[in-house]
Amino acid sequence: MSQVELLNQTLTLQRFPPMPEETPLQAWEAADEYLLQQVEQPSGPVLIFNDSFGALACALAEVRPVSVNDSFIAHQATRHNLRLNDIDDSLVTMQDSLSPLPDAPELVLMKIPKQLALLEQQLRALRKVVTPQTRIIAGAKARDIHTSTLTLFEKILGPTTTTLAWKKARLIHCAFSAPALADAPETLSWKLDGTPWTIHNHASVFSRTSLDIGARFFMQHLPEAVEGEMVDLGCGNGVIGLTLLAQNPQAKVRFVDESYMAVASSRLNVETNLPEAMERCEFQVNNALTGVEPESFHAVLCNPPFHQQHAITDHIAWQMFQDARRCLKWGGELRIVGNRHLDYFRKLKKIFGNCTTVATNNKFVVLKAVKLRKSR
């Protein structure tokens, strides 16, 4: 938690979920400051995109902006920091990236997302609502703005220029001119090898163009003949949960992710590939298993992320593991896949008191930890 001066306001900002105090990671970056230096008090609608921890929303709360993000955690972070600064969180409207945008914004401020596909989806959504009078400004670390980034802005919206770097950040200014543009499909689809399934992926889903190799390995080592409720935690496009449904015809599966597009992709993939299993499914956008009742599940399956936005961190994996233990029934298991170098074995042993290796190859390991009662 630390303070920053933004738009003549001293704001206290904290990363979310909260991290240890000794972390060097901050809840804002130079691109946030650089973007806000361009802002004169707007009188019309303001759209903010990809505001990871709410720095832009907190600074602009008085003009009642709409904050658009695919991340549920980013929305939670924004609410957290608004309250931390005694700002009424109802001043900022939170919206996911799949919902229609408000018409004719006066100002658009965008933090450029990590995935080029998500940037394209957001620019195409903006194209439907901006006008030639809309000020469109995007920002990021200078190293994250590439020729492909500028090409997308010009192709979808119109003439684009960049600024000089400031504190290693750079801005993009774009003027809307409605260039001719072919339609693009809402999802990218591909056949999943070894199955009859076609997998559909919204723009921000991890490994959107093919099955990632960790998930492919994990699919070979999932539990079978489970009759209770299981969770695909951090579900992405839902291929793990889809496999669980097929291998466990008596089980229910809850698909959970902090990405709105991931949960939408999971729902679409069950609807189109195993429609008869929809009654055994639940779909939830959440920060891990926050708010879920203890002792709810027979098994939790997880391919935990080891980064948040551009930062490498293991605190999300820790939260997933701890939430899983709380929400598992006694005798229930957490089964995960991870890169071998991440040492998840030690973490699970610390949380559960036990851990066994289910399978391993030269890059990944599948681990199992069981929620056991302490022996007296």
Swiss-Prot record:
Source species: Cronobacter sakazakii (strain ATCC BAA-894)
UniProt xrefs under PANTHER family: RIBOSOMAL RNA LARGE SUBUNIT METHYLTRANSFERASE G, RIBOSOMAL RNA SMALL SUBUNIT METHYLTRANSFERASE C
Name of the molecule in the record: Ribosomal RNA large subunit methyltransferase G
Keywords, in A-Z order: Cytoplasm, Methyltransferase, rRNA processing, S-adenosyl-L-methionine, Transferase
Function as written in the Swiss-Prot or TrEMBL entry: Specifically methylates the guanine in position 1835 (m2G1835) of 23S rRNA.
Major location (coarse): cytoplasm
Record flagged with keyword S-adenosyl-L-methionine: yes
Record's catalysed reaction(s): guanosine(1835) in 23S rRNA + S-adenosyl-L-methionine = N(2)-methylguanosine(1835) in 23S rRNA + S-adenosyl-L-homocysteine + H(+)
InterPro entries documented for this protein: DNA_methylase_N6_adenine_CS, rRNA_m2G-MeTrfase_RlmG, RsmC/RlmG, SAM-dependent_MTases_sf, Small_mtfrase_dom
Gene Ontology MF terms in the entry: 23S rRNA (guanine(1835)-N(2))-methyltransferase activity; nucleic acid binding
GO cellular component terms, semicolon-separated: cytoplasm
Keyword Methyltransferase: yes
Subcellular location: Cytoplasm
Enzyme Commission number(s): 2.1.1.174
Membership in a protein family: Belongs to the methyltransferase superfamily. RlmG family.
